[in-house]
Amino acid sequence: MDKFSFKDVLVTFAGLFITTLVAWVLITSTGNNPSEVAKYLYEGGFKGTRNIANSLYQATPLILTATATLISFRVGMFNIGINGSMYVGALYAGWAGYRFTNLGHLSHVTLCILIGMTVGALWMLLPALLRVYAGVSEIISTIILNFVAVLFVSYMANGPFRADPIAPATARILETAELKQIFPNSQFNTGFFIAVIVAILAHFVLNKTTFGYELRSGGDGLVGVYPSRFSSYLGIPSDRSAIIGMLISGALGGLAGAIEVLGAVRYFFQELEFNQGFDGILIGILGKLEPIGAIIASLFYGAIKNGGFFVDYKTDVAREIIIAVSYTHLRAHETSLHLVCRLLLE
């Protein structure tokens, strides 16, 4: 386990002090009481069954997008296009949710999830091939594909998949395709457990299997750099690792989108927005690019995000201010979070 010096602890507390001071100034400038805002933030994220359930719901896609991020980073590919995979995964999972009939619940849900994951993976195939065989930066290509995904799903929701004569949306998915909601009056559903299982499985595969070792060897160090010199020394083709890593990353993005449609909104509509892909990049880094760390960081961030909604409802403080300040607090807590992750991993 890594040793933590007094300097690490000092930097952590200094960061907490500075971010607390900034938060106090920002909140006071809006004419609100910082203590009251902190109380609402805590209540919205951590107090009461419904609020906790909603916090877990907010954490669900973050666990998957953070895991998708860390896998691509570990193979040396900087995938910024997870949002695009979420969009196409959500669209086609929603389509499969009403298109296929006469299926049992488990079969229908599984089919929808597999379709969402497959489409999400295929969405990342082009930037992976462009990077490996043409040297095109995956950062640029995946960012472009994010915009292409938005335009594509908008076209499909307005055209071939449109079922609502008023709004650009698909038909509602069948009950056999729905993920079960755990608590009434909450969007928390069984998708959370799927996300946690997937992240734990990713941890096992990356750290305990030969396949995971070959993937990790595709990058130089924790954050990979493609092509990897280390991989070539071992005789492992880094090209293959890069492509497979991008496909897995896209599949997890598609899974996150599929769970959102199957477990919460129940259909795909044009105004559906996904920003969890970008959040997943920050959370994946905060979790030290380890799946277990991604789970922990996602739970914290999900609670803060839900608490931000509660603060926005109760006060005049913008939710964006709360999330920005809270994320900075999480960054200040990075040393302690790293310690928790190391304790769980060893």
Question: What are these language model-derived features?
Answer:
Residues 25-30, 40, 45-100, 113, ...:
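Single transmembrane alpha-helix segments in multi-pass membrane proteins
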Residues 328-335:
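Conserved small/polar residues in nucleotide/adenosyl-binding loops
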Residues 49, 138, 142-208, 319:
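Transmembrane helix-bundle core of multi-pass membrane transporters
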Residues 1-14, 331, 342:
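Transmembrane alpha-helical segments of polytopic membrane transport and secretion proteins
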Residues 11-27:
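N-terminal signal-anchor transmembrane alpha helix
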Residues 101, 183-267, 291-292:
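Helix-loop-helix "hairpin" substructures at the membrane interface of multi-pass membrane proteins
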Residues 2-10, 73-81, 103-106, 110-168, ...:
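Short loop segments and helix-boundary regions at transmembrane helix junctions
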Residues 246-324:
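Transmembrane alpha-helical segments in multi-pass inner-membrane proteins
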